[in-house]
Design a protein with these regions (language model features):
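A conserved, hydrophobic alpha-helical segment in the catalytic core
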Residues: 131-141, 232-246, 279-312
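Residue-level signal for inorganic ion chemistry
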Residues: 119, 140, 173, 287, ...
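Glycine/charged-rich beta-loop-alpha catalytic/anionic-binding loops adjacent to active sites
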Residues: 56, 78-81, 268-277, 323-328, ...
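A short glycine/serine-rich beta->alpha loop
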Residues: 83-88, 274-282, 348-349
Length: 483
């Protein structure tokens, strides 16, 4: 007798979720990524557990790289013939995860797909894990992020640890080079799989303030055999002996790294192989290493994901490319520019930045670009971004002043003035810097000239700019690609 009300609640929750999402998308009010899940949970608190029951699930969490790593895993699983559920938009709170599973279920709330790759917010992990019972939990890294929401990084670590403890059966895939993430392997019964970089990268005198300067066990200052970036690297504590674990999956050598990707020598256990990663920058090597490790822990063949990494595409504002139509001769003449230039396309690359470590790594990536380009930096301080923007003073904007390929910098967003001040103190030539807060005018300025444009937005500014760039280039929204 108790089963009927439960089934009825599930049916109503799923129906409401699907209806709200359909309405939002058809009315042009967004992708329906979170609100449908909130509505569904009003009808049934068990709707997520019901609609995910029996599925094999990988959960990806951590400060940076969640969306990209999840995309790598989804691509590999799809290419291996599996029908995969994924929260492609990055809606990674409990409501967003609920919406994905409920909308993918049949009208009785039964899952129609066998497996899922879900990125999960660090703070939501403790809510999501006990409801979906993942087979694998991958933790990418831990950095300061949204200080007014999470507080300092140790609080974020505590929240992730609480989430991990909710499922002792899940395999933990951990970044061996991150002393904070690595500590999740202490005193947990879960099986652990480790990934990392077995080599130094870049400047061995880090220019970014460390988020993990002291040993998490005894408080002594860490020493390093080498750094990769920020506080990541081969760390060890000279006092208590806490140190980096030798990873099971690791990049041993970078054979090539350019603006479009990397070729590396990758170690899996005791064997090595050549792997091409179709996304650039050092942090994407970590994302790739984590994806390979998680794929193997999930039961997949490492060779399969190693092959798919060469063709993986950028996702939703993370190294995403747009071919923006250049201004026509008529438009240029109206704006007082030379009308003789041939209209074509302007390459635009969008790179989401939201904390000091990610921002500094993006600036490092820009230092590797051959040829001149224009730069746009956007900063909002809305709820989804975090209202505290003090982190921009810890990012390595000073390197922008050293980059002779940057021909102009446009600052935009709610806190554009703060960016302009930060660039001034970073030593950037003030004549190169302009401010444009109107997104339509910003788009028009991008279309002028032929130099490539790199855009560094934080989260809400990325959503706004991505929409106008998608409209201007005819790019479909993420849900329009789904069947």
């Amino acid at each position: 007798m108790q089963r009927k009300p439960f089934i009825l609640k599930t049916i109503m929750a799923v129906a409401a979720c699907k209806a709200v999402r359909a309405f939002l998308r058809r009315s042009g009010r967004g992708g329906g990524t979170a609100l449908p899940g909130k509505v569904a949970r009003k009808f049934s608190k068990q709707v997520l557990e019901t609609t995910s029951e029996g599925m094999d699930i990988i959960v990806v969490t951590g400060t940076n790289g969640k969306t990209t790593t999840a995309n790598m895993l989804e691509t590999a699983l799809t290419e291996s013939g599996k029908d995969v559920l994924a929260n492609k938009s990055g809606a990674n709170l409990l409501s967003g995860v609920t919406a994905e599973f409920a909308c993918a279920a049949d009208f009785l709330g039964r899952p129609k797909k066998k497996c899922a790759v879900i990125e999960c917010d660090e703070g939501a992990l403790k809510q999501v894990v006990p409801e979906i019972h993942p087979k694998v939990i991958l933790v990418t890294n831990l950095f300061r992020d949204q200080l007014d929401r999470y507080g300092e990084v140790m609080n974020t670590l505590k929240q992730i640890r609480t989430g991990v403890e909710k499922d002792p059966e899940a395999v933990l895939v951990l970044n061996a080079d991150d002393s904070l993430v690595s500590s999740l392997g202490l005193h947990t019964p879960n099986r652990k799989v480790w990934f990392g970089l077995d080599m130094p990268v870049g400047d061995q005198s880090p220019r970014v303030i460390s988020d993990a300067l002291h040993c998490i066990r005894c408080g002594a200052e860490y020493q390093y055999h080498y750094y990769t970036y920020a506080h990541l690297g081969s760390f060890y504590c000279p006092k208590c002996g806490y140190s980096r674990v030798k990873p099971d999956f690791a990049v041993e050598k970078i054979d090539r790294m350019d603006a479009d990707g990397s070729s590396v020598t990758f170690r899996i256990g005791s064997e090595t192989r050549n792997v091409t990663v179709g996304l650039p920058a050092v942090y994407n090597l970590y994302n790739a290493a984590g994806a390979i490790a998680a794929y193997a822990a999930f039961g997949g063949k490492a060779d399969d994901i190693c092959r798919s990494l060469s063709t993986v595409h950028s996702s939703f504002g993370r190294m995403e490319k747009f071919d923006l139509p250049a201004a026509t001769s008529k438009e240029r003449a109206q704006q007082g520019a030379a009308a003789s230039e041939t209209a074509g396309t302007v390459p635009v690359r969008m790179i989401l930045v939201k904390n000091p470590a990610g921002c500094s790594q993006t600036i490092d990536y820009l230092s590797r670009i051959d040829g001149d380009f224009r730069l746009v930096i956007c900063l909002n301080d809305r709820t989804a971004d975090g209202h505290d923007i003090s982190w921009i003073w810890d990012a390595d904007y000073e390197r922008l002043s050293e980059n002779t390929h940057i021909q102009s910098i446009t600052v935009s967003g709610d806190r554009a003035e703060d960016l302009r001040v930060r660039l001034k103190y970073a030593g950037v030539n003030e004549k190169k810097v302009t401010m444009e807060k109107d997104n339509e005018k910003l788009l028009a300025s991008m279309r002028e000239g032929s130099l490539p444009v790199f855009v560094m937005p934080n989260y809400t500014s990325m959503l706004a700019l991505r929409k106008i760039l998608s409209d201007a280039t005819g790019k479909k929204e993420f849900w329009e690609k789904q069947v």
